[in-house]
């Protein structure tokens, strides 16, 4: 059995080798193709398209804005996948895309041209389906461009922005994001995990990758118990038994209440947070 991999590219490669022979459970590979090689492959996190769709739904349902702009890295599958799904779901959720701006990994330091177009578009909210390093630069340059009144909304890649070196975290005040876990959540389960993680890792604060992995281990244990796995079973038999057992697992984990479909996808609701006073505060 394999807990992993972390990223989509490696997961697709490993999944091709593991198909039907080694049970594989990725905590955080978000590309759709990460778990499509075999029926023995499962995922804890949301797919890229699901993040885009659910973000559009959340923004629309909570009336956060009607005029929305997007700024994303078009050279990365993660960013592009989320963007495409978000744009596709915008209209049915009452959102008008007034600017859809892109950059690439070769031009991810100066966003002035894109931000000017976004500012001129009259956007009320800027959707940022990027990782936190790029988003930190974007927030700084948006502030410099006089765009503090434009709301900012990200996805799980935004998690970690408060820890970016030399980033003025006050610029993240009011930023909203969908992510499955926050180390500042006040529920007993999350706080116990955070304390144990910090104690074991020299006060390093766990992020959603750590929480997803924690949940994967407990979901795998639940499936192994249900399947009555024994050491003398072959890899193929273990894989088949685990795959069948996973369909009956219901996990109340750090990242939410989860169950799984026959195609290995996780069925759970995302959590929305707003950064307030340097901490994540869960939104309704």
Each model region followed by its residue ranges:
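Sec-exported extracytoplasmic/periplasmic mature domains
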Residues: 15-20, 57-66, 87-95, 116-123, ...
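Beta-alpha junction/loop-to-helix N-cap segments that form part of ligand/metal-binding clefts
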Residues: 1-34, 103-109, 259
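Extracellular/periplasmic bilobed ligand-binding domains
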Residues: 17-21, 85-178
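Ligand-binding clamshell of periplasmic/extracellular solute-binding protein-like
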Residues: 3-12, 27-34, 128-136, 154-162, ...
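Hydrophobic alpha-helical segments within soluble ligand-binding/sensing domains
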Residues: 44-67, 80-82, 108-112, 135-136, ...
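Extracellular/periplasmic periplasmic-binding protein-like sensory domains
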Residues: 142-214, 274, 280-282
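Segments of small-molecule ligand-sensing domains
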Residues: 199-210, 221-279
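An alpha-beta-alpha
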Residues: 41-102, 125
């Amino acid at each position: 059995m394999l807990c992993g991999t972390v990223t989509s590219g490696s997961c697709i490669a490993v999944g091709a080798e593991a198909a039907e022979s080694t049970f594989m459970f990725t905590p955080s590979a978000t590309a759709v193709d990460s778990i499509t090689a075999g029926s023995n492959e499962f995922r804890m996190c949301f797919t890229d398209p699901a993040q885009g769709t659910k973000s559009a739904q959340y923004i629309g349902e909570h009336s956060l804005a009607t005029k929305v702009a997007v700024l994303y890295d078009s050279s990365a599958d993660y960013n592009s996948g989320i963007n495409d799904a978000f744009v596709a779901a915008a209209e049915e959720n009452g959102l008008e895309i007034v600017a859809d701006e892109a950059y690439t990994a070769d031009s991810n330091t100066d966003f002035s041209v894109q931000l000017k177009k976004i500012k001129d578009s009259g956007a009320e909210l800027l959707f940022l389906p990027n990782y936190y390093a790029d988003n930190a630069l974007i927030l700084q340059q948006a502030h410099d461009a006089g765009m503090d009144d434009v709301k900012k909304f990200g996805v799980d890649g935004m998690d970690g922005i408060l820890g970016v070196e030399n980033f003025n975290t006050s610029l993240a005040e009011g930023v909203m994001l969908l992510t499955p876990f926050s180390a500042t959540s006040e529920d007993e389960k999350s706080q116990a995990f955070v304390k144990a993680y910090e104690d074991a890792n020299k006060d390093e604060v766990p992020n959603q990758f750590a929480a997803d992995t924690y949940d994967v281990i407990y979901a795998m244990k639940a499936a192994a118990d249900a399947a009555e796995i024994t050491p003398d079973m072959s890899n193929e038999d273990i894989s088949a038994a685990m795959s069948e057992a996973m369909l009956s697992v219901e996990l109340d984990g750090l990242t939410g209440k989860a169950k799984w479909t026959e195609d290995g996808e996780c069925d759970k609701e995302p959590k929305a947070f707003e950064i307030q006073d340097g901490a994540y505060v869960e939104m309704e």
